[in-house]
């Protein structure tokens, strides 16, 4: 979703919310949480508050009128009824024959509510310096995790990674082969953004940064001489991230045409630009997702920018066998998240089995 539309949607949801959610929003904006995260949380709160009214737990006429005491007095049984409602309600997707929402969606909803309750019961300071209330019903609600071992997840993800020489083959395909089957009209659009698209893909594959981190890069954040980019990680921390040298020519090519191609002026500080009717703007996450999906599907299999992050992490672990190094590259505080990559790179285990 484009940033302007995202901000419009956020304001629309904020206009519906009770005062304590608006306080929560302002607090998390200062952390800062991303606008995308806050938007998703507001959507979940709207769904939950509508249920409170429809089920008769709250006698408020609208969401904004819901009293904070309603949240304080919710029982474990109430929350379990809400989860049951999510599981059994008719699907909003008319193409799906399934009832209810997925477990992933339920977990996301409960996570959003847990964040709100933690704020209200632990983080906020009322006039007396104390939280608004202390009883946190969400601590009594457990989430159901998907039953899948790391090995099974790794095998599933492995099919969607560009490992070994496929990393360079993918870049070469976009640069030299993708255009062959395009119409003349499609070629015109492709040529306009070719250098930029290659630079973005190369940056993701060479650094493993998150999509949001790539989108928010400014010109001042990249140092091609040292092959380092400065990014803002989750939670707002600044971090310097190394890039593999294979990305340099793609980034240099893009930077050489950036100003003229996208009509960039001094005030246009974003690294990756898009241009519409002569006006340059920072490229948004949705555009990059669609771009990566388009090229990857034509090359081998449709993937997301996050799979390019997995690709870099797996290749780096394969080369170093160091989870610590990989976790630092990805910006993780612990190596637990990188356990996945030890299962993707499991040739030693397979070789041992072959020798039995």
From Swiss-Prot:
Active site: 210, 234, 306, 309, 332, 341 (o-(3'-phospho-dna)-tyrosine intermediate)
Cleaved signal peptide residues: none
Gene Ontology CC entries for this record: cytoplasm
Localization in the cell: Cytoplasm
Domain of life: Bacteria
Keyword Cell division: yes
Biological process per Gene Ontology, one example term: chromosome segregation
Every Tyr recombinase domain range: 169-354
Pfam families, per the entry: Phage_int_SAM_1, Phage_integrase
Major subcellular location class: cytoplasm
All copies of domain Core-binding (CB), residue ranges: 16-121
Activity regulation statement: FtsK is required for recombination.
Keyword annotations from UniProtKB, A to Z: Cell cycle, Cell division, Chromosome partition, Cytoplasm, DNA integration, DNA recombination, DNA-binding
Entry annotated with the keyword Cell cycle: yes
Record-level Gene Ontology MF annotations: DNA binding; tyrosine-based site-specific recombinase activity
Family statement: Belongs to the 'phage' integrase family. XerS subfamily.
Role description: Site-specific tyrosine recombinase, which acts by catalyzing the cutting and rejoining of the recombining DNA molecules. Essential to convert dimers of the bacterial chromosome into monomers to permit their segregation at cell division.
Protein name: Tyrosine recombinase XerS
Organism listed in the record: Streptococcus thermophilus (strain ATCC BAA-250 / LMG 18311)
Origin organism lineage: Bacteria, Bacillati, Bacillota, Bacilli, Lactobacillales
């Amino acid at each position: 979703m484009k940033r302007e539309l995202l901000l419009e949607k956020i304001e629309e949801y904020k206009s519906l919310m009770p005062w304590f959610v608006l306080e929560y929003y302002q607090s998390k904006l200062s952390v800062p949480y991303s606008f995308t995260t806050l938007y998703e949380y507001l959507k979940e709160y709207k769904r939950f508050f509508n249920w409170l009214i429809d089920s008769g737990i709250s006698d408020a006429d609208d969401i904004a009128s819901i009293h904070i005491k309603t949240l304080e007095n919710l029982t474990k049984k109430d929350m379990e009824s809400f989860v049951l409602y999510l599981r059994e309600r008719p699907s909003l997707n008319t193409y799906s024959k399934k009832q209810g929402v997925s477990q992933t969606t339920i977990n996301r909803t409960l996570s959003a509510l847990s964040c709100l309750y933690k704020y209200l019961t632990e983080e906020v300071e009322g006039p007396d310096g104390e939280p608004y209330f202390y009883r946190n019903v969400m601590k009594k609600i457990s989430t159901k995790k998907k039953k899948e071992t790391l090995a099974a997840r790794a095998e599933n993800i492995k099919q969607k990674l560009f490992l070994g020489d496929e990393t360079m083959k993918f870049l070469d395909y976009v640069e030299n082969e993708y255009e062959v089957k395009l119409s003349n009209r499609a070629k015109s659009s492709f040529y306009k953004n070719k250098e930029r698209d290659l630079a973005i893909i190369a940056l993701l594959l060479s650094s493993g940064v998150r999509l949001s981190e790539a989108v928010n890069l400014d010109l001042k954040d990249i140092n091609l001489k040292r092959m380092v980019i400065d990014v803002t990680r989750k939670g707002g921390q600044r971090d310097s991230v190394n890039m593999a040298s294979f990305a340099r020519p793609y980034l240099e090519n893009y930077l050489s045409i950036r100003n003229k191609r996208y009509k960039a002026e001094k005030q246009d500080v974003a690294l990756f630009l898009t241009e519409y009717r002569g006006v340059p703007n920072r490229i948004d996450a949705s555009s990059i997702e669609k771009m990566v999906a388009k090229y990857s599907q034509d090359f081998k299999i449709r993937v997301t920018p996050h799979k390019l992050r997995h690709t870099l992490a797996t290749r780096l672990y394969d080369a170093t066998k160091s989870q610590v190094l990989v976790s630092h590259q990805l910006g993780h505080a612990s190596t637990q998240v990188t356990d996945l990559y030890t299962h993707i790179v499991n040739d030693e285990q397979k070789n041992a089995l072959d020798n039995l």
